[in-house]
Amino acid sequence: MQIELAKTAASRPATAFAIVANVVDWPEIISSIKSIEVLTPGPIRAGTRLREDRIIFGRGLTQELEIATIERPHRLRLLANHPDLHYELDHVIDAVYGGGCRMMLIFRSRPATPTGRALQPLMSPFMEITLRDELERDLPDLATAISRHGPN
């Protein structure tokens, strides 16, 4: 399953990326995220592990994420490997002609078990609607934080 969403913001890509890549501030930016704990010592980089507490589907969820890729000022990719489902979430930022930037959230998932693979055709439509709703709440929160910093 893949879900893609995009939104523009009145900011330079480098400024937007700095806000998106500062994952420790996400609880102040993204309303569904209640806390982020950095589990890997040192600066945020590829390989950094995080523990995220968020409200999803109306319930609390704690998950461990890994920063798989940081390509400044363009892309931040997070990975989650759950026993039943593996997923990736890309935050991609591009310049927009005339100024500003476009931020995309790209969610990709794949079942991790034979049972999950068998159920995927039945579950995907329901999961996609619900996950899209969740991402559609996160994206404006990020865009608002980015726009607060203006077109600098």
Residue ranges, per PLM feature:
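Hydrophobic ligand-binding cavity/cleft-lining segments
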Residues: 1-45, 141, 147, 152
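Well-ordered beta-strand positions
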Residues: 8, 68-69, 94-95
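Beta-strand elements of well-folded, non-transmembrane domains
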Residues: 11, 58, 109-113
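Short, flexible segments with low predicted structural confidence
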Residues: 15, 38-39, 64-65, 106, ...
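Glycine-rich portal/gate segments that line the openings of hydrophobic small-molecule binding cavities
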Residues: 38-88, 100-102, 137-152
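Beta-strand/loop substructures that line and gate deep hydrophobic ligand-binding cavities in soluble
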Residues: 79-133, 137, 142
